[in-house]
């Protein structure tokens, strides 16, 4: 019985990381979409907005990397 529960816990951890990765991908999509929308409104700010977009994408992807790190740490 204990081995079955261990297998279920391992599967739940994998599902949890998968959901975290999906959340990160949605976040990146929102950041990039809003940047494109902002550049369409004010093209003169394109360079500054692009830099801010990369910072936002980096922070969003860092959450996914933290998620995979905790998955391997607590596995």
UniProtKB/Swiss-Prot annotation:
It is found in: Cell membrane. InterPro entries: ATP_synth_csu_bac/chlpt, ATP_synth_F0_csu, ATP_synth_F0_csu_DDCD_BS, ATP_synth_F0_csu_sf, ATPase_proteolipid_c-like_dom, F/V-ATP_Csub_sf. One of its GO terms (molecular function) is proton-transporting ATP synthase activity, rotational mechanism. This is ATP synthase subunit c. The keyword Ribosomal protein does not apply. The gene is atpE. The chain crosses the membrane at residues 12-32, 49-69. Keywords: ATP synthesis, Cell membrane, CF(0), Hydrogen ion transport, Ion transport, Lipid-binding, Membrane, Transmembrane, Transmembrane helix, Transport. HAMAP family: ATP_synth_c_bact. Belongs to the ATPase C chain family. Its main location: membrane. One of its GO terms (cellular component) is proton-transporting two-sector ATPase complex, proton-transporting domain. It is a multi-pass membrane protein. F(1)F(0) ATP synthase produces ATP from ADP in the presence of a proton or sodium gradient. F-type ATPases consist of two structural domains, F(1) containing the extramembraneous catalytic core and F(0) containing the membrane proton channel, linked together by a central stalk and a peripheral stalk. During catalysis, ATP synthesis in the catalytic domain of F(1) is coupled via a rotary mechanism of the central stalk subunits to proton translocation. Key component of the F(0) channel; it plays a direct role in translocation across the membrane. A homomeric c-ring of between 10-14 subunits forms the central stalk rotor element with the F(1) delta and epsilon subunits. It comes from Tropheryma whipplei (strain Twist) (Whipple's bacillus). The lineage of its organism: Bacteria, Bacillati, Actinomycetota, Actinomycetes, Micrococcales. It comes from the Bacteria. The record marks 61 as: Reversibly protonated during proton transport. F-type ATPases have 2 components, F(1) - the catalytic core - and F(0) - the membrane proton channel. F(1) has five subunits: alpha(3), beta(3), gamma(1), delta(1), epsilon(1). F(0) has three main subunits: a(1), b(2) and c(10-14). The alpha and beta chains form an alternating ring which encloses part of the gamma chain. F(1) is attached to F(0) by a central stalk formed by the gamma and epsilon chains, while a peripheral stalk is formed by the delta and b chains.
